[in-house]
C-alpha cells in the first residue's frame, strides 16, 4: 500500500494495527524499564553507574537508527518490526543468565539496536497516513496507547516481582503481543519511501523546534523512567511503591493526552509546546517539597507525567506539519534519535546530580531543560506570530 492509497482509506482504521502494537510496546516497556536500575541499586552500584548502564540502550539505537528507514523501505514495515521484536525476546531471556553492569550494559546496548525499530517504523507509519487537521489527536492517541501499556507494566511487577529472572521472562513473553496485531498487515502496511535527495542534517533543520522538543522530552521521560523509582526509594518508600509511581506518572498521560492533542489541533502548536514545558518545570521543581508518603505526591507525579509526556507528541505533530512535503521517514528517524540522545545525556547527568545533591538533583536537572525548551518555544512563537 502506498502512502497515498493509505491516506485515502480512513486514517483511524489504517492506524489500528500500529496503535495496538504500540500499546503492547508500552506494556513491555512498563515492565522492563525499572528492572535494571533497581537490580543495580540493590547490588550497591552508585547512581552514576546506573545512569551509564541504562544509557547504553540509547547508544545502541543511535548506532543503528539511521539504517531503519532504508530497511523498512526495502523489506516492508511489518517484516522489520516483527524480526526486531523476536530479537528483543532473546535479549530479554539473556538477562536471566547474566549479571553486573558490564554484561547488562552490553545486553542493553544490543536491546537498543533492535528496540528502536518498531518504535521508529510505527511513527513513520502514522505520519505517512494522518491528515494535517487530525495530526495532534492522532499523536495523542498514540501517546495514550503507549502510556496505557506502560501504566499496566508496574502493576504486572506487583505480581511477578522486580528482582530475579521472572520479570525478564515476562518481558520476553510480552514481546509476542507486539507482533500479533502486525502480522495480518504483512503486505498491506503503508509503503515507506526514502527521498534520495535529503540527509539527516537537512531534515533536522526543517523543524529545529520540534527536534529540540524531542531532545528535552526524551531527556525528561527517560530520566523519569530510570530514576523515579530510585528517587522514591531514597525519599523513604519501598521499591514496589516506587514502581507504582511510574504507573501514576504514565497514568497522567492517559488522562491529559487527548485534551492536549485537541489543543495542538486548534491552537498554535508552538504555544502549546511552551506551556507543557514550563508547567513541567514548575512541577519537577516542587516535587522535592512534597512528602513522599502523602497523597499530594500522587497528584504532582500525575500532572508531571501527563503534561511532560505531551512534549513528545506535540513535537511529533510539529514535525509532521513542518516536513509534510519532505522526507518524513528520515525526519521521524532523526526525531527519535534526538529523543534518545536526550536520555543518553540526561541519565548520567541526573545520576551524578543525585549523587551530589540527593533527591533534589532529579528535579533540578529536569527543570533546567524544561525551562530552556519552554523559553525557546515562546520566542519562536512570538517571533513568527509578529
Where do the model's predicted regions map?
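Helix-loop boundary and gating motifs at the non-cytosolic
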Residues: 9-58, 221-231, 235, 242
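Helix-to-loop junctions at the C-terminal end of transmembrane segments
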Residues: 64-76, 161, 256-268, 354-355
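Structural signature of the two symmetry-related core transmembrane helices
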Residues: 79-93, 271-285, 367
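Cytoplasmic helix-loop-helix junction between adjacent transmembrane helices
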Residues: 109-144
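Intracellular juxtamembrane helix-capping segments at the cytosolic ends
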Residues: 117-130, 309-323
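C-terminal membrane-cytosol helix-exit motif in multi-pass small-molecule transporters
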Residues: 172-192, 376-380
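C-terminal transmembrane helical hairpin of 12-TM major facilitator-type secondary transporters
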Residues: 270-313
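A late C-terminal transmembrane helix in Major Facilitator Superfamily
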Residues: 326-356
Amino acid at each position: 500500500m502506498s502512502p497515498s492509497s493509505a491516506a485515502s482509506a480512513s486514517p483511524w482504521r489504517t492506524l489500528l494495527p500500529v496503535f495496538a502494537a504500540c500499546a503492547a510496546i508500552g506494556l513491555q516497556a512498563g515492565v522492563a524499564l525499572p528492572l535494571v536500575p533497581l537490580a543495580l541499586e540493590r547490588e550497591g552500584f552508585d547512581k552514576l553507574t546506573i545512569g551509564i548502564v541504562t544509557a547504553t540502550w540509547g547508544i545502541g539505537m543511535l548506532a543503528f537508527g539511521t539504517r531503519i528507514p532504508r530497511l523498512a523501505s526495502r523489506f516492508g514495515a511489518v517484516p522489520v518490526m516483527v524480526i526486531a521484536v523476536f530479537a528483543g525476546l532473546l535479549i530479554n531471556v539473556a538477562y536471566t543468565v547474566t549479571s553486573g553492569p558490564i554484561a547488562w550494559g552490553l545486553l542493553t546496548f544490543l536491546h537498543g539496536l533492535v528496540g528502536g525499530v518498531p518504535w521508529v517504523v510505527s511513527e513513520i507509519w502514522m505520519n505517512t497516513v494522518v491528515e494535517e487537521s487530525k495530526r495532534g489527536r492522532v499523536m495523542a492517541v498514540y501517546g495514550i496507547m503507549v502510556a496505557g501499556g506502560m501504566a499496566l507494566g508496574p502493576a504486572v511487577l506487583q505480581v511477578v516481582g522486580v528482582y530475579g529472572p521472572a520479570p525478564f521472562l515476562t518481558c520476553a513473553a510480552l514481546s509476542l503481543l507486539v507482533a500479533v496485531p502486525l502480522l495480518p498487515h504483512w503486505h498491506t502496511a503503508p509503503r515507506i519511501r526514502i527521498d534520495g535527495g535529503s540527509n539527516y542534517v537537512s531534515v533536522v533543520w526543517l523543524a529545529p523546534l520540534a527536534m529540540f522538543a524531542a531532545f528535552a522530552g526524551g531527556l525528561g521521560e527517560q530520566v523519569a523512567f530510570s530514576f523515579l523509582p530510585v528517587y522514591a526509594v531514597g525519599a523513604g518508600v519501598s521499591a514496589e511503591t516506587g514502581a507504582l509511581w511510574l504507573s501514576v506518572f504514565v497514568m497522567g498521560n492517559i488522562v491529559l493526552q487527548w485534551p492536549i492533542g485537541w489543543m495542538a489541533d486548534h491552537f498554535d502548536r508552538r504555544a502549546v509546546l511552551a506551556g507543557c514545558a514550563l508547567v513541567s518545570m514548575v512541577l519537577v521543581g516542587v516535587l522535592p517539597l512534597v512528602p513522599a508518603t502523602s497523597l499530594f505526591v500522587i497528584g504532582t507525579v500525575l500532572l508531571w507525567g501527563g503534561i511532560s509526556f505531551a512534549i513528545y507528541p506535540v513535537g511529533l505533530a510539529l514535525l509532521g506539519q513542518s516536513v509534510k512535503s519532505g522526507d518524513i521517514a528520515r525526519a521521524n528517524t532523526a526525531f527519535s534519535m534526538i529523543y534518545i540522545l536526550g536520555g543518553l545525556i540526561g541519565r548520567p547527568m541526573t545520576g551524578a546530580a543525585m549523587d551530589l545533591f540527593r533527591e533534589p538533583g532529579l528535579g533540578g536537572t529536569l527543570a533546567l531543560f524544561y525551562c530552556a525548551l519552554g523559553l525557546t518555544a515562546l520566542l519562536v512563537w512570538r517571533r513568527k506570530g509578529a
